Amino acid sequence: MGCGMSTEDKEGKARNEEIENQLKRDKMMQRNEIKMLLLGAGESGKSTILKQMKLIHEGGYSRDERESFKEIIYSNTVQSMRVILEAMESLELPLEDARNEYHVQTVFMQPAQIEGDSLPSEVGNAIAALWQDAGVQECFKRSREYQLNDSAKYYFDSIERIAQSDYLPTDQDVLRSRVKTTGITETTFIIGDLTYRMFDVGGQRSERKKWIHCFENVTTILFLVAISEYDQLLFEDETVNRMQEALTLFDSICNSRWFVKTSIILFLNKIDRFKEKLPVSPMKNYFPDYEGGADYAAACDYILNRFVSLNQAEQKQIYTHFTCATDTTQIRFVMAAVNDIIIQENLRLCGLI
């Protein structure tokens, strides 16, 4: 009797293989929903990434949605100038032109939240005049010594446009607007065959205890670090360096028992501000073991190695990207690369590669 496989056996084997492949495909379908957790210290750029996803994958902002950002942008702009003027008092920096004192009073008279369809003309004029004052400029250069919104310069430079009665926020205006995230916000979008549910959680220390609710079945963690903050102190604790806080937080996330099998993507963000700062604020002043001077590539390598070296699990790969979260073209490219990483991870976890 021959030892070859019978037709019936061959058909049975083929059926088994088809069933196994179908099970793998079903498993893959279950994994087509990607739960992505956005983590990072306060003001690292998490909310900006969410806004970019809306611009890139959801057709952007409607006119009504843009209108809704006006009051936030007005408030950000006025509040930023107020912060500088208060810092001038504590740093004992005088105005160059004493006539601008009138404009200082105009800014201080404004409420914390600016309401209305347009910025009052006297407020726009006050900010424009003060931004030209050499004393204000000197204080701005020392902004690492106090807590100033990243978008301050952008809005001050655009004040003439923002103060127009028919002003409508642009994509860039919206991206740079800042509202502190409290609680958990979710954004859903589709890239190819994958549905992403992206969760943004508050980055300030007081918000971190709420993260635990997001941890179950997380596919990927997108961890953001504002590398431009190497010379700044925490908003919540002005004895702690912001970069050191980010390193401590990344260590706890990367090596957490919750995330043993979770892929981690690290965005080293705000490279534009980082590049501007390096020549004027030596990194060695804050990280004494750094030897690269003002060299941008050397500084990037140093920071990258500081974060990646915290990973204690040999089998866990950290995927890294240097980013500028307000640059839509770059974020579109980077998120396409992230999508490819997640597809490969899915195939591997489902046993298809």
Curated annotation (Swiss-Prot):
Binding site for GTP: E43, S44, G45, K46, S47, T48, D150, L175, T181, G203, N269, K270, D272, A325
Listed Basic and acidic residues bias regions: 7-25
Lipidation (N-myristoyl glycine): G2
One record GO biological process: secondary metabolite biosynthetic process
Spans annotated as G1 motif: 35-48
Function in brief: Guanine nucleotide-binding proteins (G proteins) are involved as modulators or transducers in various transmembrane signaling systems.
Name of the protein: Guanine nucleotide-binding protein subunit alpha
Organism: Emericella nidulans (strain FGSC A4 / ATCC 38163 / CBS 112.46 / NRRL 194 / M139) (Aspergillus nidulans)
Protein's gene: fadA
